[in-house]
């Protein structure tokens, strides 16, 4: 969430940002309204408490002057006013922050402003499209040809958008995970495997409000949700902590299974394993100082691109328009890889700078040890590999005329030397 000082000192900056998101500004107006009520109430409360203290100190003199009952009566009235005002102030603060949670991050100046994703800006492309002397198939047909997944049986067991990974595709999945983790470890990241569950309080601090209905699975009769991404558990890793400035940046990579309802994508990509309810992902997460977060965002994207360059997958980097950014994001780049069988680019990676917005919710700060001047730091995150989607992309780019799939060179060591997945 945004710093409350920003609403007081630079409200126009927030109004402008919300307009760039093509939203009504009512939430900003309500924050300012209830913050004014809270501040006014707090001032009145402090005045009443000061008056009560003065009255309490005057009891002895009032007794000498013979007006003790009058002073006691005034003191009781002030105490009653305090008791009446305190819950009102708490309610003003609660309502203020409820609206504050609904206001998105300040849009970065480099974000293209538009209300349609058709205006996403292509920053650069990398790699050559594969050349085929046959009509390339899409990933749905290809995974069936190599008998790499069983979605029909899985739908009977668990419902739609679930799957059994089979045979060489299972090992390809594991190869991608190991490859990505090793690449990131070599770049100085700390590898982790995070919990698959998150408490509701922590989910509220690390997630979008809209995710609870559209994305997150709730565990019945438990104060737990299944994570949609390791970003959530990585963001909470240093919750309510102060990190020494000398230790920044902190770079983590984490393997997790991710669980998503995909309620907002009904009817999209219902076949194959591209858009599913359960998938593996290696996530990157960085804690940085405000001064270095833009540079860290560039490095984060560079490291991510290196993974797909080594996999030999052609891609484009796209700056996402303002209206499509989630609340946490100040700026986001997507890596969209080329799917020749489908004839289109498709998103494999989102790389986001949340600046201080996310860290403020989870109360993660930085400062010199013992200095007492801790400040909110910046957080950044990016997909390294969402393996099921990347498998789909590999299938289309590395397909052979007979339906077999060549294995990217960098993955062969993780596949026990296997170089090709044969069609069945």
Curated annotation (Swiss-Prot):
GO terms for biological process: selenocysteine biosynthetic process; seryl-tRNA aminoacylation. Consists of two distinct domains, a catalytic core and a N-terminal extension that is involved in tRNA binding. Its main location: cytoplasm. Catalyzes the attachment of serine to tRNA(Ser). Is also able to aminoacylate tRNA(Sec) with serine, to form the misacylated tRNA L-seryl-tRNA(Sec), which will be further converted into selenocysteinyl-tRNA(Sec). This is Serine--tRNA ligase. L-serine binds at residues 229-231, 283, 383. GO terms for molecular function: ATP binding; serine-tRNA ligase activity. NCBIfam families: serS (TIGR00414). GO terms for cellular component: cytoplasm. Belongs to the class-II aminoacyl-tRNA synthetase family. Type-1 seryl-tRNA synthetase subfamily. Homodimer. The tRNA molecule binds across the dimer. Pfam families: Seryl_tRNA_N (PF02403), tRNA-synt_2b (PF00587). ATP binds at residues 260-262, 276, 347-350. It comes from the Archaea. It catalyses: tRNA(Ser) + L-serine + ATP = L-seryl-tRNA(Ser) + AMP + diphosphate + H(+); tRNA(Sec) + L-serine + ATP = L-seryl-tRNA(Sec) + AMP + diphosphate + H(+). It comes from Methanosphaera stadtmanae (strain ATCC 43021 / DSM 3091 / JCM 11832 / MCB-3). It is found in: Cytoplasm. Its EC number is 6.1.1.11. Keywords: Aminoacyl-tRNA synthetase, ATP-binding, Cytoplasm, Ligase, Nucleotide-binding, Protein biosynthesis. Pathway: Aminoacyl-tRNA biosynthesis; selenocysteinyl-tRNA(Sec) biosynthesis; L-seryl-tRNA(Sec) from L-serine and tRNA(Sec): step 1/1. The keyword Protein biosynthesis applies.
